[in-house]
Amino acid sequence: MAPELAARYPAIQTYAGQSLQNPAVSARFDLTPQGFHGLLLGSPVGKVVIEPVDAAAGLYASRTASSSASWSCTLPASTAKQPTVANRGQAAAFGSTLLTYRLALACTGEYATAVTANATPAVATTKLNVLAAMVTAINRVTGIYEKELAIRLVLIGNNDQLIYLSAATDPYTNDDGSAMLGENQANVDAVIGTARYDIGHVFSTGGGGIAALQAVCDVNIKAQGVTGLPNPRGDGFYVDYVAHEMGHQFGGNHTFNSVTGSCNGNRNRQTAMEPGSGTTIMAYAGICGADNVQSNSDPYFHAISQDEIRSYVLDTRTNYGGACPVYTSTGNQAPVVTAGASYTIPQGTPFTLTGSATDANGDALTYAWEQMDQSSQGGAPAAAATSTTAPLFRAFAPVSTGTRTFPRLTDILSNTATIGETLPTVARTMNFRLTARDNRPGGGGVGSASTAVNTTAAGPFLITTANSAITQAPLSTFTVTWSVNNTTSAPINAANVRILFSTDGGQTFPYVLAANTPNDGSQGVVFPNVRTSTGRLRVEAVGNIFFDINNADITLSGPLPVTLTRFTAAAEGTTALLHWTTAQEVHNAGFEVQLQGPDDQEFRKVAFVAGQGSTTQSQSYALRVPDLGAGRWYVRLHQLDEGGQTGSFSSVQSVLIRVPAVAASIWPNPLPAGQGTITVELPTAGTAQVTLYDVLGRPVATQPPLALAAGKTDVPLTLPAVPAGLYMWQLTVDGRPATQGRVLLRP
């Protein structure tokens, strides 16, 4: 909200956040008379939504999916002032400048009733409560736009003048989106003034979605945007629909390639780069019948949408998208991306693309590979297999690695095909874009690079052995066979292959059975000295990106290399005491000791204890793991065979480390001019340091470290000049986080 609007409605508060443990995760929160609402973006489980079930009772629900709704989105007669972008090359990086637009958001009386009196639980139909619902929606949308496009939306200072509480007296035709385009333009211009806003929109409960294309900053059409659903609340409304319709106003076209269901008649040829319904914001996820790739949109823009929107908002000519925003330097630098070389591969064969990026700010990056192809006509995703131009592969939400396998690994391992993951069966060129995001709240940095994959009539390249379940002994010999199918000839020229083995069902392939053997269709190998019931073989081209995995699990069974008879863990102060005993050992190199702490996401290696090789005598081992923090720690053993072959894992033991608590408080609170006292109580002597963080989790001030004795100590606190407001503080003792709190700084 603009400062003057926020001042009139102090009960409505919005927040932006970023995870300290995983900076790729960003958050938007709001606290209003209707409760707490939250959105997490970039989490390991995808988008997470937090919404009140009964705010008065403090009951909230979190979930990862949006609710579906019947939907119709249309564009009026073209208002585009410049050609749409269909560039397959590298897009211009951005993120160093934040573009802020003044949003005039109106509503019909029906919308006001829907989000108040007809809500669950019901609240009074007042401007405060309606504005609260609007703020929740725009806080979600601007959180996405800031991260994806470096665009911020701010509700204008007198936006409450556009809130209508009665359907009988509002100036809108609630169920007619086309009519409301002109009605909203006229009303916002009259009530607010043409020069006092940059983009206008109206919420309703009918009429679907409709918006003028390339409307932002254009005095003739900038308020022509409508979003209306019978239930205009929840993340399905905010992300799938509001962000979508505003995307049109910022210059984004539809990205789906389907022509069935609601997709029929709404496809845009130049930007139809997503198979089926598509999954990104400017697609039609869940409303294209048999071509639905998934039920709801993911909260990010396809690369072609970023191209279109950024092209429009950087055009500073009169009535174009760059003519009216406020430009603010963010200090951020966009990632620099490398997509890798182009390759030629056989048709009908899986492949993997790998790229990378660097970030001058050291931000945690996420990556998304997307196909950048479009055909003259739309069609079913499966039909793209025989097309030389249609998009084959869907978009997936950005992940922490620059590697993507086509089709997705789960399809390969299960021998199934899903919508939007189709291998080509003809010779063609596939164009791909790797986009890297730094996910910074307040203006995300985005960079990209492109590459191409060419398929030929050769192929498919397929493993022809172990395609049904088999059982072998560890260290046994086995002949792997595969169909070469002209992959040694030009232009593929794959003279050699690498043969790998997996023990986890094909998720990873740590065992090299043949590093560089001729691509002649047959090779004898020796299985590793491991036991597994979920083994898989992978044959991949050396110096190329294509491969195949056999279709069924391979079982390797035989005597265990180590018989573990006892494994215990106990606490002694801040040390974990580990003891274990073996009955026999066969080719045992030793034990990797792995630990997982209270704040760890996975186990990590902390020590290695050498084994006894081969022996039939009982052996005892012990290890002390010192300097553990408070909390429950988990420990396991990873036995390794001689030669570096991985063996088996032990059971997991837990140790509860109890450390006397550290207490601290800053007073007075509020703190005038950064001057006050911090009282610290330590169980033992240590070096303490206080760091101040802003609401985005960025450190803004740090006190010099102080050596303190055990017990309670009052330490003068002097913080450098920082703006007044609410801050988080954290106390570290001997370099470890000990406690934290909040402090309000006054001028």
Residue positions per predicted region:
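Short, compositionally biased serine/threonine- and acidic-rich segments at solvent-exposed termini, linkers
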Residues: 557-662
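C-terminal tail/sorting-segment detector
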Residues: 642-660, 678, 702, 716, ...
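Extracellular acidic, Ser/Thr/Pro-rich low-complexity tracts
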Residues: 345, 356-361, 438, 483-490, ...
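N-terminal prosegments of processed precursors
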Residues: 1-52, 179
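Recognizes extended acidic, P/S/T-rich segments that occur
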Residues: 381-418, 423, 511-515, 590-630
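Fold-level signature of zinc-dependent metallopeptidase catalytic domains
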Residues: 59-216
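Short, surface-exposed loop/turn motifs with a glycine/proline- and acidic-biased composition
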Residues: 610-634, 704-736
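The catalytic-center signature of Zn2+-dependent metalloproteases
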Residues: 156-179, 218-299, 370, 374-380
